[in-house]
């Protein structure tokens, strides 16, 4: 049976800018129904991920839907868009990690329940799917991005790193913070614990990633050699977690997460997986056990609507920033206001393809 988390109170959500200023609500989207035979199913993760997996039957996708954990991701958030998978979609992916302790709320202790004590979001991504459903864009927001965290249910109400919102107020406050930062309305939420990477990777028999230069993680003591590395579940978890010992720290970790998600998608959709029912079922079962989604999220509906997507149709982007600075005694990532407004404005206007064509360096596919 699906797990449901408790609701929170209900203050109003307003649209913001990349620096958190309030504004008018985003324009409602026009729905264009497009129904047909199921050919794809979305599994997922994150640190977060959308996987488009071909060859699953309608009944099996329905069974996967029933296995997903559910939460009231929009508790306390008013003026939500209508729930339809036709038209554009903006899906927030959160990769949570409980190993290192929580950030502390300026208004009190770390919130338990929706987020959970000692749980935080180490990967924050927005999946944007245009209205024609021919492409998809996964936009990473560095977890240390310095933003205005709005108040919700007595938590937040301060400037902080964006991932503090999850520790302070769980998924609802994270949704509100991301919407405030981007000016983009979130349609659905998918959260995965980083430990879910292990089971999904092992179910596929491991994945291959390319590393540019040999590097050792000082925490896990694992060495990733220059060239192609075959990662099992434990190695994959270390790969997406590492930031110490990397030339650009957390920025390289963001790119590693993007590289790993692409490798996982490619492995999950190759012929060796699709032609092996046992492997495919093992992977999808591992994914659904690790996922928490909003109450209206439907794998079945998304499998119908996004049936033409393949891993090669997905581009990875990082929200523009000016690098790290020291503010109030802590190292934070400073958003590039002008460039970020342009990117997130393109998401809102459904013109990301044009933005990416004008900014090709932001298509993140390099090895780390």
PLM regions and their residue ranges:
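Non-catalytic, solvent-exposed segments at the cell envelope interface
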Residues: 2-368
């Amino acid at each position: 049976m699906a797990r449901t988390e408790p609701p929170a109170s209900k203050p109003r959500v307003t649209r913001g800018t990349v620096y958190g200023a309030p504004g008018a609500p985003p324009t409602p989207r026009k729905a264009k129904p497009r129904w047909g035979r199921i050919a794809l199913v979305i599994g997922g993760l994150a640190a977060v991920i959308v996987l488009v997996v071909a060859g699953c039957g309608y009944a099996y996708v329905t069974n996967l839907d029933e296995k997903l954990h559910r939460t009231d991701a929009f508790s306390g958030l008013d003026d939500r868009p209508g729930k339809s998978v036709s038209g554009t979609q903006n899906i927030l992916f959160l990769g949570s990690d409980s190993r290192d302790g929580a950030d502390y709320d300026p208004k009190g202790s770390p919130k338990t329940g929706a987020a959970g004590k000692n749980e935080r979001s180490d990967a924050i991504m927005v999946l944007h799917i245009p209205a024609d459903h021919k492409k998809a864009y996964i936009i990473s927001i560095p977890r240390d991005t310095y933003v205005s965290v709005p108040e919700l249910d007595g938590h937040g109400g301060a400037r902080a790193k964006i991932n503090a919102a999850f520790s302070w107020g769980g998924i609802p406050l994270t949704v509100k913070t991301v919407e405030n930062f981007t000016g983009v309305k979130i349609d659905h939420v998918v959260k995965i614990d980083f430990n879910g990477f292990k089971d999904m990777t092992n179910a596929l028999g491991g994945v291959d990633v390319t590393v540019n230069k040999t590097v050792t993680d000082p925490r896990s003591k694992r060495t990733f050699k220059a060239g192609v590395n075959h990662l099992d579940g434990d190695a994959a978890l270390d790969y997406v977690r590492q930031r110490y010992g990397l030339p650009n720290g957390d920025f390289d970790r963001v790119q590693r997460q993007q590289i790993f998600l692409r490798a996982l998608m490619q492995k999950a959709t190759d012929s060796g997986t699709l032609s092996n029912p046992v492997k495919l079922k093992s992977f999808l079962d591992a994914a659904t056990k690790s996922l928490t989604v909003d109450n209206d999220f439907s794998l079945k509906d998304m499998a119908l609507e996004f049936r033409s997507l393949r891993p090669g149709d997905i581009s990875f982007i990082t929200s523009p920033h000016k690098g790290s600075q020291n503010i109030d005694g802590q190292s934070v990532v400073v958003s590039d206001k002008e460039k970020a407004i342009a990117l997130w404005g393109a998401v809102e206007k459904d013109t990301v393809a044009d933005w990416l064509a004008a900014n090709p360096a932001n298509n993140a596919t390099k090895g780390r």
